[in-house]
Amino acid sequence: MATKQKEVTTFDVQVAEFIRNHKQKGTATDDEINASLVIPFTLDADGIEDLLQRIQDAGISITDNEGNPSARVLSNEEEPELSDEDLIGSTSAKVNDPVRMYLKEIGVVPLLTNEEEKELALAVEAGDIEAKQRLAEANLRLVVSIAKRYVGRGMQFLDLIQEGNMGLMKAVDKFDYSKGFKFSTYATWWIRQAITRAIADQARTIRIPVHMVETINKLVREQRNLLQELGQDPTPEQIAERMDMTPDKVREILKIAQEPVSLETPIGEEDDSHLGDFIEDEVIENPVDYTTRIVLREQLDEILDTLTDREENVLRLRFGLDDGKMRTLEDVGKVFNVTRERIRQIEAKALRKLRQPSRSKPLRDFIED
C-alpha cells in the first residue's frame, strides 16, 4: 500500500506540474502528453482516458502537432443527443426570462442532416459567410446541451452558453470535413474546452492553484462514481480508499472545493432581503452598544462636572476615562507634583461624592444592565 501510495503521489505531482506548465498556453499536444506522462508511467487505456480528462478539466485543450483537436480525444468524445428537452426545463439551471427568451429563439432553428452539414462545411471552406452563420446557428442547441453539464461550477447558465458559443465559432472556422468526423463531434470538443477553461479562469472568487483545481475535479468524479455504486453519498473514508489518500486529505480538499456564497444572495420568496442582512458584522460595533456607550459617556461627563477640577482630572487619569489607560497613584502624583498619598485622598473624596444618590442615580440604569 505504501509503495502504491508513493507511485500515485509521484504521478499526481507530475500531472500537476504538467498542467502548471501548459496552463498559460492553454494547449498540450498528444506527443507532449505521451513523452511526459503516458510512456514514463506506462499508462493503460483507462489510465490515459482519466489523464486526458484531468488535463481537459484544468482548461487545457489537447491537440495534435498542427493545433487541431486530438484524434484520440475526438474518438472518445461523447456527443450529446439533442432533443426539445434541451430547450425547456430539464436543466437544473434556474431558467429566468433572458434564458427562456434565448432558448425559444434558437429552438426554431432546424437541425441539419448529414448531407446538409457536409454541404455547409464545404461552403465554409470556400469562404461562404452565410454558410458559416447557418452552420453555427444550427448547432446552438448543442452548446446549450453541453453547458447544462457545467451548471453549479461557479458561472451563470447564460455565461456558460456564451463561452460555449465562442468555442462553437472556433469549430466552424477550423472544421475539416475530410478528416472523417461529424461536425457536431468536432464542435463538442471546442465547446467543452471553451467552457471548462472559462470556469477554471473565471468561476471562483477565491483563486485556487491549477494543480488543486484538477485534484478537486478528480475527487468530484470519484464522488459521483461512488454515489452511483453505493446508492448514497460516499464518506470521506470511502473516497480516500478509492483515491489512495488519507481521509483527512479528502476532507481538506472538500473544504477547499466549497464555493463562496455572495452576501447579495436573495433570501425569501420575494427576494426582498439578502444574506448579508442576517450576518453580524463582528468588526463594526453593535448600534445598541454604540448608542449606550455614547449616552453613558455623556452622563458620566455631566456627573464629573459637579466635582472640582482637580478631583475630576485625578479620576480621569486614574481610571483612564479619556484614553483607556489607567495610571498608578504615583504616576498621577507626578502630574500634579504631589505625593501618592495625597492623590489617594483626593480620589477617595471624589468617589464619596459620586456615591451620593443625587449624583449616582443617572448611572444606576447602566450598572443594572
UniProtKB/Swiss-Prot annotation:
Positions of region (Sigma-70 factor domain-4): 303-356
DNA-binding region: 329-348
Renumbered ranges of motif Interaction with polymerase core subunit RpoC: 159-162
Extent of Acidic residues compositional bias: 76-85
Molecular-function GO term, any one: sigma factor activity
Location within or outside the cell: Cytoplasm
Recorded superkingdom: Bacteria
Keywords attached to this entry: Cytoplasm, DNA-binding, Sigma factor, Transcription, Transcription regulation
GO cellular component: cytoplasm
Entry-linked InterPro entries: RNA_pol_sigma-70_dom, RNA_pol_sigma70, RNA_pol_sigma70_r1_2, RNA_pol_sigma70_r2, RNA_pol_sigma70_r3, RNA_pol_sigma70_r4, RNA_pol_sigma_70_r1_1, RNA_pol_sigma_70_r1_1_sf
Region of interest: Sigma-70 factor domain-3: 214-290
Region (Sigma-70 factor domain-2): 135-205
Region entry Disordered, spans: 63-85
CDD domains, sorted: Sigma70_r4
Biological process per Gene Ontology, one example term: DNA-templated transcription initiation
Principal location: cytoplasm
Oligomer and partners: Interacts transiently with the RNA polymerase catalytic core.
Functional note: Sigma factors are initiation factors that promote the attachment of RNA polymerase to specific initiation sites and are then released. This sigma factor is the primary sigma factor during exponential growth.
Family statement drawn from the similarity comment of this UniProt entry: Belongs to the sigma-70 factor family. RpoD/SigA subfamily.
Identification of the protein by name: RNA polymerase sigma factor SigA
Organism: Streptococcus pneumoniae serotype 4 (strain ATCC BAA-334 / TIGR4)
Name of the coding gene: sigA
